Amino acid sequence: MEMKWKFFLLIIPFLTGCVMEHNAYRVADVTLKDSQPCISVDNDPTLNDGQAKLLTLSLSARDAKGEMQEVWKQDSFDNPTYTIQAGQCIPVKYPFKGDDEYSVTVITAQPTDKVSTKRLWSRNFKINELTPE
């Protein structure tokens, strides 16, 4: 009987799960502007004072095998200089195709050395399914 109680007490935290108060994951905004995707981030207190820096922007495309493969990346993780403004388009120099499926991941931080302010935005999209701005 005592073993059942120990098991019950141990299993409760696993069944209830963990509520993440400061979830680092967000959904990136992707719209169509001048026939090109406009990738932006918004709705986060770390962006409010205009000091958040772009650490990484990664773009992947679905290949012929149906797998996502990285096709473009801007990596400034060690020395970030680009300041992110909420709702501002982040430049991506890549020749997008209308029917291809893409996945974008944006990582920001403010200040860059503070782990608790790192945020990750992600989104899958197709150019021909985006809403024009």
Regions found by a protein language model. Give the residues of each.
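C-terminal motif of bacterial Sec signal peptides marking the signal peptidase cleavage site
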Residues: 14-17
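Acidic, low-complexity Ser/Thr/Gly/Pro-rich repeat segments typical of extracellular/periplasmic
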Residues: 42, 46-133
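Contiguous beta-strand segments within globular domains
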Residues: 24-51
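Sec-dependent signal peptide recognition
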Residues: 3-11
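Hydrophobic alpha-helical segments, principally membrane-spanning helices and signal/leader peptides
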Residues: 1-2, 25
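Bacterial signal peptide processing site
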Residues: 19-21
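Secretory-pathway extracellular proteins and peptide precursors enriched for disulfide-bonded cysteines
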Residues: 9-10, 29-30, 79-82
